[in-house]
Amino acid sequence: MAIGLEDKKAIVADVNETASSALSLVIADARGVTVGKMDALRKLARENNVRLRVVRNTLAKRAVQGTDFECVNEALVGPSLLGFSMEDPGAAARIFKDFAKEQDKFEVKALSVGGKLLPASQIDALAKLPTREQALGMLASVMIAPVTKLVRTFNEVPSKVTRAVAAVRDQKKDAA
């Protein structure tokens, strides 16, 4: 079915807007995956703030021009499902990786982060990135660690004095 010029422009503008604000992109081939399974994937993507789009490669190439994902042009061959991570850079990679384990016909083609095109074999590295909450928790624990050590050091001085006084007291009791 032919798409009109105005519709094509709208699709390009929509995908460009999404790509401009996305943190990472995962491209997959979903040929042979049932509609029911794709609906489940779309639902999971919505829950994780990942935007999925299936667009013609020529439109996708135009849409990513001027964004960090301009490097994916060579990976846009054949049917492509684009997964844009909007909040967590590893979200789309985790979703696609888990889905590919369940579906033999689902194949990750490439990924892109920070303006670099990565092969599909690098999906584990991207999927293992911590979520925003995990990263903030790690940062907080790193920031709190020196304060915790300082508090322990301050608490250790009085307890050493107390142990020394108790030892002297016990020594005097034994001597008497």
Swiss-Prot record:
Record flagged with keyword ATP-binding: no
Key word Oxidoreductase present: no
One Pfam assignment: Ribosomal_L10
GO MF term list: large ribosomal subunit rRNA binding; structural constituent of ribosome
Gene Ontology CC: one annotated term: large ribosomal subunit
InterPro entries registered for this protein in UniProt: Ribosomal_uL10, Ribosomal_uL10-like_sf, Ribosomal_uL10_bac, Ribosomal_uL10_bac_type, Ribosomal_uL10_CS_bac
Superkingdom: Bacteria
Alphabetized Gene3D superfamilies for the sequence: 3.30.70.1730, 6.10.250.290
Keywords: Ribonucleoprotein, Ribosomal protein, RNA-binding, rRNA-binding
GO biological process: translation
SUPFAM superfamilies: Ribosomal protein L10-like
Matching HAMAP family: Ribosomal_uL10
Family to which the UniProt record says this protein belongs: Belongs to the universal ribosomal protein uL10 family.
Quaternary structure note: Part of the ribosomal stalk of the 50S ribosomal subunit. The N-terminus interacts with L11 and the large rRNA to form the base of the stalk. The C-terminus forms an elongated spine to which L12 dimers bind in a sequential fashion forming a multimeric L10(L12)X complex.
Function: Forms part of the ribosomal stalk, playing a central role in the interaction of the ribosome with GTP-bound translation factors.
Protein name as annotated: Large ribosomal subunit protein uL10
Naturally occurring in which organism (per UniProt): Teredinibacter turnerae (strain ATCC 39867 / T7901)
